[in-house]
């Protein structure tokens, strides 16, 4: 985000430090002091860090080897002329904060800003958008390959439980370990899909004419994808496509309402809207049909190095949508004990409109 690039700050979060210098590890502290930056880590990672860090805005992070990351950061801060240091309080434990605050005293003000580093990442550049697009394309391919697999083995196996299917879909997502998951996949059959983030059951088994809700994503060069489809299971013609035909009329009605809500939101979102206004496009459709109480979560969330980033597309979000923001549009209806539908795609604000990624 504009205005944050030259602010002095620190982070121990891996995705935040990767954004700053193109490298991270599980024991490091990234520190920016005015126009200098430092990647502080222990001896296990210093060589790799020196080989991997990349300049950002013309500044290359200096790799500092340390057995005490916080003390090394304190030493550097004290020597600098910095008067204020920003950090995300959600990423720093109380012990670290107290230690910094005690050592810096009145010389340097520690300024906690929730989601500070996510604010810096809220607008994606073209390179990031292309990585997200590739990640989502691989995700879509995994949906297609998994559907083919389920059709193929349905008659061969006596039973396919939710738990088995949820475990198996990971192989299609990761390409047997080539890619990491962006989150634990959600696979829910029939009434279990009425729980938005259902846990897979070993007691529920796939049968013809069941519904399947599948929400999943991978990481491509660390950038996340996220997609949800709800499908009718026909062993002869099973595809995670937008057009679905359910035998039960009530289920078909609910599915069509969610589909209409998502389409209205995607076609209606514009740069300059607030997240609240974007949310209302989808929520309004569902409410007008009388299902508002069953749409129990926000319409969307930003995505990038983290699966959940800014902006939030929710009924409380005052964030102004701008060019380059990437987020999900995922309305849903969840009828407890009966049925659940969610349809999710990623969009980017481009030329003042939302465009499918």
UniProtKB/Swiss-Prot annotation:
Binds 2 cobalt ions per subunit. GO terms for cellular component: cytosol. InterPro entries: Creatin/AminoP/Spt16_N, Creatinase/aminopeptidase-like, Creatinase_N, Pept_M24, Peptidase_M24B, Peptidase_M24B_aminopep-P_CS. It comes from Helicobacter pylori (strain ATCC 700392 / 26695). Co(2+) 1 binds at residues 226, 301, 330, 344. Optimum temperature is about 40 degrees Celsius. Hydrolyzes the N-terminal amino acid residue from a polypeptide chain, with a preference for substrates containing multiple alanine residues. Co(2+) 2 binds at residues 215, 226, 344. Belongs to the peptidase M24B family. It holds the Pfam family Peptidase_M24. GO terms for molecular function: aminopeptidase activity; metal ion binding; metallopeptidase activity. Keywords: Aminopeptidase, Cobalt, Hydrolase, Metal-binding, Metalloprotease, Protease. Its EC number is 3.4.11.-. PANTHER family: AMINOPEPTIDASE, AMINOPEPTIDASE YPDF. Its cofactor is Co(2+). GO terms for biological process: proteolysis. This is Aminopeptidase HP_1037. Optimum pH is 4.0-5.0.
């Amino acid at each position: 985000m504009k205005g944050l690039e030259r602010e002095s700050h620190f982070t121990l979060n891996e995705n935040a430090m990767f954004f700053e210098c193109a490298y991270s590890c599980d024991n490091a502290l990234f520190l920016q002091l005015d126009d200098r930056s430092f990647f502080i880590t222990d001896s296990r990672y210093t060589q790799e860090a020196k080989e991997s860090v990349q300049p950002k805005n013309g500044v290359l992070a200096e790799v500092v080897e340390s057995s005490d990351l916080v003390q090394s950061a304190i030493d550097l801060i004290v020597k600098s002329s910095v008067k204020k240091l920003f950090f995300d309080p959600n990423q720093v434990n109380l012990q670290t904060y107290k230690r910094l605050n005690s050592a810096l005293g009145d010389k340097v003000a520690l300024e906690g800003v929730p989601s500070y580093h996510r604010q810096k990442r809220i607008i994606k550049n073209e390179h990031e958008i292309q990585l997200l697009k590739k990640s989502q394309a691989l995700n879509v391919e995994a949906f297609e390959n998994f559907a083919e697999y389920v059709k193929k083995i349905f008659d061969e196996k006596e039973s396919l439980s939710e738990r088995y299917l949820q475990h198996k879909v990971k192989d299609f997502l990761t390409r047997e370990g080539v890619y990491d998951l962006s989150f634990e996949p959600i696979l829910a059959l029939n009434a279990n899909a009425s729980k938005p983030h259902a846990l897979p059951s070993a007691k529920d088994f796939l049968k013809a004419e069941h519904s399947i809700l599948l929400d999943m994503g991978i990481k491509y060069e660390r950038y996340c994808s996220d997609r949800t489809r709800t499908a009718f299971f026909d062993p002869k013609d099973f595809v995670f496509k937008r057009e679905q035909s359910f035998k039960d009329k009530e289920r078909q009605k609910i599915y069509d309402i969610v589909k209409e809500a998502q389409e209205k939101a995607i076609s209606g979102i514009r740069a300059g809207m607030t997240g609240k206004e974007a949310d209302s496009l989808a929520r309004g459709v569902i409410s007008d049909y009388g299902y508002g109480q069953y749409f129990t979560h926000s319409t969307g969330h930003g995505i990038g190095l983290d699966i959940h980033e800014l902006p939030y597309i929710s009924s409380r979000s005052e964030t102004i949508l701008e060019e380059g923001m990437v987020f999900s549009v995922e309305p849903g209806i969840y009828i407890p004990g009966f049925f659940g539908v969610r349809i999710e795609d990623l969009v980017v604000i481009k030329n003042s409109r939302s465009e499918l990624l």
